[in-house]
Amino acid sequence: MIKCEKKGVTVKETVASRVINEISIRLPSLSVNESVARSVCASFCAQLDPTATEIADVKCAVSEAVTNAIVHGYRDEIGIIYINVRVYEERVVRIDIRDKGRGIEDVKRARQPLFTTDAENERSGMGFTVMESFCDTVKVSSRVGRGTSVTLIKRFSAR
């Protein structure tokens, strides 16, 4: 079941709300691949004929999630970032971004605006807040030493 919590809309994965297309990619955690992930996800969403603003929203949210995996999940090592994008009949997209990196010790605290484990970087601490502002639902699960999974759900407007 997919729930767009901000707008109170629930979409169940049934015949009426089935996945109409899906893509999975794996990328090394190199900073150059942040733009690749952003472009692939936005291009895949184009089949729903979204507005330019909706595409920009997807790009920003994906960029933040992938950057978190690169910078915080893997830090100074190279690992794999797993991305799965599902498009549903009801003009809903679900993007799962997963790493097998360091994990987050306290997810609730990490989701607070301006919280960062990288105090030297003045632009840190807003990633989850940015994702939440551009998506209907953002889910985060993590285990220290096992990695983090971020699910972004966005409903596109009717055209």
Regions of interest found by a model, annotated:
Residues 22-27, 48-51:
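A short, mixed-charge helix-start or loop-turn motif at secondary-structure junctions
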